[in-house]
Regions:
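Acidic, proline/glycine-enriched N-terminal capping motif
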Residues: 1-62, 66, 71-75
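Acidic, low-complexity central loop/insert segments
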Residues: 22-24, 31-32, 77-217
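Glycine-centered loop/turn motifs
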Residues: 58-60, 145-160, 215, 220, ...
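Residue-level signal for inorganic ion chemistry
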Residues: 37, 87, 124-126, 180, ...
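Short, conserved charged micro-motifs
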Residues: 39-44, 94-97, 129-133, 185-192, ...
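Anionic-ligand-binding alpha/beta catalytic cores of soluble enzymes and soluble regulatory domains
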Residues: 179-267, 271-272
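Glycine-rich, small/acidic residue-mixed loop/short-helix segments
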Residues: 227, 233-240, 246-249, 253-349
Length: 349
């Protein structure tokens, strides 16, 4: 997770993300897997951290696939469509997850297929996303209100150019919106239709600013194959404490119950001071001469007008209010303060 770099983003795109309808091409950075067969839910339920068996058609959840040692292979969003499950996850993890899922199939009626090349993915986010999606994607009498009231991870099927389009409610960047899964052959036409209706294309750097402000870890940036979910703070969203066994459960339960949830390090939010220069992913953290951790994601927040970051900090220094030293080569030492996340509360909260 070492990455000394400063992301560049568009302030105009950032405004659209918060005030209008922002369109992000996610086809390349997200992978898409499909599971079919009568046993698909029970099968996936036994592997992932969340309650897949309980998902009715039109519902979904956030989950993780772990090693037996409790380390993350990937996080993912799981959508039950009624006749199949669709999983979307970081593209870098997609093939490894597909292979691992396939390796566990014995006599179960399950087929796992990579649909990443056949199905494109667009993210549509912001307060105008539901209204705009309803105007472009046909669905009989369904209204924009019906889309706006769709619960998180819920899904509905619509059509575009006589092709099915799956809309999944999401908040990956801390801003409500939808993942739109569409036949790749009409992806370009869908993009143009959404833009013609009022959406504005944004880049991933702009979306990443909102993600960091929301305190959301991203796989490959803030989580990797060495991470235990409890270290990343995703347990409330990704882990069911009432379901049956899953791979890696023993480690998770041991930490939660015997260790009272204590892990050696935690992903926390930190704020710096304007004028001291940007915070960069990969910068080292110290406290009183002791190594304290490192930054994993960082940006200058347009709304706070201060540099902010996510990073892993030793549990001795992870409580809000701790002041840590930031060190990077021969640069002057600067300081950050540990704070609670999200850095910015979503509108209406």
């Amino acid at each position: 997770m070492q990455d000394i770099s400063a992301p560049m983003f568009s302030h105009d795109d950032y405004r659209v993300l918060h005030e209008g309808a922002a369109l992000l091409d996610r086809t390349a950075d997200r992978g898409r897997l499909e599971l079919r067969g009568a046993d698909r839910r029970d099968y996936l339920h036994g592997l992932l951290t969340n309650d897949i068996a309980a998902l009715p058609a039109g519902a979904g959840c956030y989950a993780a696939l772990l090693t037996p040692q409790g380390r993350m292979i990937s996080d993912m969003r799981v959508s039950e469509l009624g006749d199949r499950l669709v999983v979307d996850l970081a593209a870098s993890a997609s093939e490894g997850v597909r292979q691992r899922l396939a390796d566990f199939i014995f006599s179960e009626d399950v087929e796992v297929q990579d649909i990443g090349a056949a199905v494109a993915q667009w993210g549509l986010y912001g307060p105008a996303a539901a209204q705009l999606a309803a105007s472009v994607l046909a669905a009989g009498t369904a209204s924009s209100d019906a889309l706006a009231s769709l619960p998180l991870y819920g899904n509905v099927e619509r059509t575009f150019r006589d092709r099915p389009a799956i809309l999944v409610r999401s908040d990956d960047f801390g801003i409500g919106g939808f993942e739109i899964l569409i036949d790749a052959s009409v992806s370009g036409l869908l993009q143009q239709a959404l833009v013609d209706a009022g959406a504005q294309r944004i880049d991933v750097a702009t979306a990443d600013v909102a993600r960091i402000e929301a305190g959301r870890p991203a796989f490959g940036r803030d989580m990797d194959t060495t991470t235990i979910p409890l270290e990343a703070g995703i347990e409330d969203r990704a882990i069911s404490l009432t379901k049956g066994c899953y791979v890696g459960q023993e480690i998770i339960i041991r930490v939660l119950h015997r260790g009272q949830g204590r892990v050696a390090k935690r992903l926390v939010g930190m704020v710096g001071f304007a004028g001291e220069g940007p915070l960069l992913a990969g910068m080292r953290l110290e406290s009183g001469g002791r190594e304290a951790g490192s930054l994993t994601s960082a940006v200058d927040s347009p709304r706070l007008r201060r540099p902010i970051a996510l990073g892993y900090v030793h549990r001795d220094f992870s409580e809000p209010g701790h002041v840590l030293e930031v060190r990077h080569g021969d640069d002057p030492v600067r300081t950050v303060t540990v704070v609670t996340t999200p850095f910015i509360q979503p509108a209406g909260e």
